[in-house]
């Protein structure tokens, strides 16, 4: 790999890291934390948190594949905190066919006894964190003919 390629790769890594930090802050905010609480948790100043959130890029304009690549570890951690497991992406993002305006299709194993209200709330939280429309389905929660197709293309996060 050439030095130019190494430089470009490093720039891409920086962009993914910036997006991941932003998504992590949005996740903390979605969980009800104040900027002051976030700052204390991270060991940074509240103005630093405020500045990062104020510089919040329009995540709607971020390529869905790049957004999932950056946000995957954050939303997986958020899901696990809430008892969800086996988080994966399917659909156009998994097939590398997503357009700029594509939604993100996620599949997850909900905790035992999760109500429909709680499941919809989790989907709404993911939309808030990622800044775009999310289609969230549960393993086994689709029509039998569709499950096989979705499972075949699901990429674990």
Language model features with spans:
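Amphipathic, hydrophobic secondary-structure cores in small proteins
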Residues: 106-109
């Amino acid at each position: 790999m050439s030095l130019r390629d190494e430089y470009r790769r490093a720039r891409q890594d920086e962009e993914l890291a910036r997006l991941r930090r932003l998504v992590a802050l949005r996740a903390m905010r979605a969980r009800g934390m104040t900027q002051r609480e976030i700052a204390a948790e991270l060991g940074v100043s509240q103005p630093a948190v405020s500045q990062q959130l104020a510089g919040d890029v329009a995540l709607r304009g971020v390529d869905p594949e790049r957004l999932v690549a950056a946000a995957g570890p954050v939303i997986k951690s958020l899901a696990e905190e809430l008892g969800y497991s086996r988080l994966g992406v399917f659909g156009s993002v998994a097939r590398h066919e997503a357009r700029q305006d594509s939604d993100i299709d996620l599949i997850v194993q909900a905790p035992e006894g999760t109500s429909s209200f709680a499941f919809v709330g989790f989907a709404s939280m993911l939309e808030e964190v990622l800044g775009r429309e999310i289609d969230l389905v549960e393993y086994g929660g689709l029509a039998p003919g569709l499950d096989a197709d979705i499972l075949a293309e699901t990429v674990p996060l």
